[in-house]
Amino acid sequence: MDIGKKHVIPKSQYRRKRREFFHNEDREENLNQHQDKQNIDNTTSKKADKQIHKDSIDKHERFKNSLSSHLEQRNRDVNENKAEESKSNQGSKSAYNKDHYLTDDVSKKQNSLDSVDQDTEKSKYYEQNTEATLSTNSTDKVESTDMRKLSSDKNKVGHEEQHVLSKPSEHDKETRIDFESSRTDSDSSMQTEKIKKDSSDGNKSSNLKSEVISDKSNSVPILSESDDEVNNQKPLTLPEEQKLKRQQSQNEQTKTYTYGDSEQNDKSNHENDLSHHTPSISDDKDYVMREDHIVDDNPDNDINTPSLSKIDDDRKLDEKIHVEDKHKQNADSSETVGYQSQSSASHRSTEKRNMAINDHDKLNGQKPNTKTSANNNQKKATSKLNKGRATNNNYSAILKKFWMMYWPKLVILMGIIILIVILNAIFNNVNKNDRMNDNNDADAQKYTTTMKNANNAVKSVVTVENETSKDSSLPKDKASQDEVGSGVVYKKSGDTLYIVTNAHVVGDKENQKITFSNNKSVVGKVLGKDKWSDLAVVKATSSDSSVKEIAIGDSNNLVLGEPILVVGNPLGVDFKGTVTEGIISGLNRNVPIDFDKDNKYDMLMKAFQIDASVNPGNSGGAVVNREGKLIGVVAAKISMPNVENMSFAIPVNEVQKIVKELETKGKIDYPDVGVKMKNIASLNSFERQAVKLLGKVKNGVVVDQVDNNGLADQSGLKKGDVITELDGKLLEDDLRFRQIIFSHKDDLKSITAKIYRDGKEKEINIKLK
């Protein structure tokens, strides 16, 4: 950097010296301003701060002038020192060493006295303020800190100065400055300590002081440490360097152990301040390397930036020296005692300096570093995330370790649990199946009982074969055919079998072929038959023990919808023992039957309706309930187009009454009143007028003929009488009249009839015997 008068220094050295100069000057001004205006509000303080920045340009000019004067004086001192060295080299080696030592000692003590005088003047100046102690200690601390900074950078600066002085740069700026004043303040504390140390030696102290006074009058030139290093290219002597390190170690030890927390707070505050004014500066070396290529003469940056970087660099240097001097504390314990009072003073000055820095920052109105706060929040969030990840990793490691230690036991435990679940499911399924099987068994038991009873019924049903000329099944069929039917063994006495069947099955033949379920056949004899009930009894003899008589049930307790089985031999022997299933479809049915095949119904048969399959050959077969008991005998079936499963059976209670008479008598005696009748529904209009029928009479019978001396004649019936009621029951036709009369075949008592004669209603009693 060219600062005029052919003085050239490196950019980095120029900037560093400029920062140090501005830092020391601004620190003194700010401390004084704080003491004078501590009771003024923030507005006034901000105005004062702005005035300081306005004066920074003047400071910049003063620095250049001071530095220029200093460099001129240094060149003169260098030339004089070279001349003295050439003279001293001509003498003896011992004399040269003595003179050189005395010269250095005298120059150093002269600087010490000058610094003492300057300190005295400063102390008088600061006593005028209300808090002189605070300002003095803060200034001493700053000066000692600057001295340590300069001593740490002296090697780098010396080489750079020597190199740049020989080769000036074309782009450097011209600056004139007197650096002597700034160096005097920075070296005063070190020289004062040396004088105090020498004064304790007694006589040696007085002699040295006199020499210093005499040399001072002669104006012996004093070289600073940096100048001496530039000329001689040698560091400080070993005793001086050791004393300097001891003093710095004692100060750092007191600061570190007593006010560690305050320094950490100050460091965080200055780091926040640094983020407002300058980019991040890691150390002085990197900063100098950047400054070698960038020239920045902004006064504001030079005022604010050095104070922050200076404090950071001082702390780094103090920490380094503190670590190095810990190993020397035992050897230097005696000397350390002498510096305890000075350490206490340094501690107090450090505390006051920190307070002053904080007040200065408040006066400057610096805003908090929001970027640093954001970075701190981001760091906290990152640390929480890392802790969460670490926790998860710890859990994973614990689980993995647990698995590696106990995996065989865990596998066995899991297998046991799975086995228990499977067995439980199996047992539940088995129990469910058992319950279902129980229900099925109950149904199966019933069904098995039914089948057992059906099998027994099959053993009681036989085939009855007879040749007949006509088929009496409904509908009427005039074609002659071989009649094949079924019969039921209702009674067995020894080897004698009593079989009930239909009258139209046996026909007119006395002997019938009886075939059993085991295909054995015998010839049976007809004991009796009744065409009005369509029942017949056949007697047969057989020693076959497989033939069983059937159990008799009760037809009076039949229930609509009751399950039934029909056992018979449809279509003959080839399909004997056929069992069909159905229900009772109807009760108390009156079925018209044509026995003589003259296309005129002869009788109303009282029966119950079933829907089981009945085919030709089932006539005379058994109708049994679920218990296998006989409840009826198949009698008829309606054979008409579009009609299915409409069959009828004679109730077993009626069958029992008839078969008893057929066994003993061979026939059934019915009462005969001796009349012939016509149905009113079949009369034409002339016949209706002849009998003088009223319009309201729709149903009934008209007496067409009366036998002489018959029961009807004896009862008073006449031809032309219209009977509408008999025995309290309405008459629909002549079949119903015969049915009511035959129903009294057992008691033969007289019954009341309601008649119309000559259009007049009348009642008469009809005799049945």
Curated annotation (Swiss-Prot):
Locations listed in the record: Cell membrane
Organism of origin: Staphylococcus aureus (strain MRSA252)
EC number(s) stated in the UniProt entry for this protein: 3.4.21.-
Residue ranges annotated for the PDZ domain, each copy included: 680-733
A GO CC term assigned to this protein in UniProt: plasma membrane
Classification via Gene3D superfamilies: 2.30.42.10, Trypsin-like serine proteases (2.40.10.10)
Active site, per annotation: 504, 534, 619
Protein name as it appears in the record: Serine protease HtrA-like
Assigned protein family: Belongs to the peptidase S1C family.
InterPro entries listed in its UniProt record: Chloro_Bact_Ser_Proteases, PDZ, PDZ_sf, Peptidase_S1_PA, Peptidase_S1_PA_chymotrypsin, Peptidase_S1C
GO biological process, one term: proteolysis
UniProt cross-references to Pfam families, sorted A to Z: PDZ_2, Trypsin_2
